Amino acid sequence: TFPVSQYEMMDAFEQIHTKSPGDVYWQVDEFYCFDYLAPHLDESMSIFEFNSLTEQLSKLDERQETALEGLLQMQVNKHMQENGGPITVQELMMLAHNVDHCHVLADVHSNEDLGKFYVENGFREDLDALPDSAYALLDYAKIGKQMRESEAGAFTPHGYVVRTEELQPLPDYEPQRDINYMIRLTLMNHENEQKT
């Protein structure tokens, strides 16, 4: 299971008799969570990059996991609009580092839910002057769709996600890398040492 420490990684390489991460074929056999990442994990990602990503993912709480799923959907939509190609590992890491730059509305799963949320919480000032009897006539789905499209939000199975600020670039992203042994150490119990 991942993430693993750098020394656990080196031990695994030693057990399969390789020192080069390029010689290692890897695949994810089972996702316990984050299964929506599967289409974005490809053979160009090194085992060290994958380990760095899983290390970041292991730090996320439930709200942040939902934020990541929403951010990924937004990034995929952006790529589709710009013909930007596949999502890179650096983008996945950047998204995982930016989960706190979002609002997550856990009980909002549709345009209608979103429209009701915005109207009932006073975010649509243009509708505040309406008499209470007019609220029953509002098309909440249309209002929600307009708001979602204007703020480029995304629905996930766990709620609605919208960015609250611009995404920040990664701070000097450098995945774990292979470190060759610098010292080989043999340990033994001093009491069992034979005296000559």
Predicted segment positions?
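Short basic (Lys/Arg) and small-residue
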Residues: D139
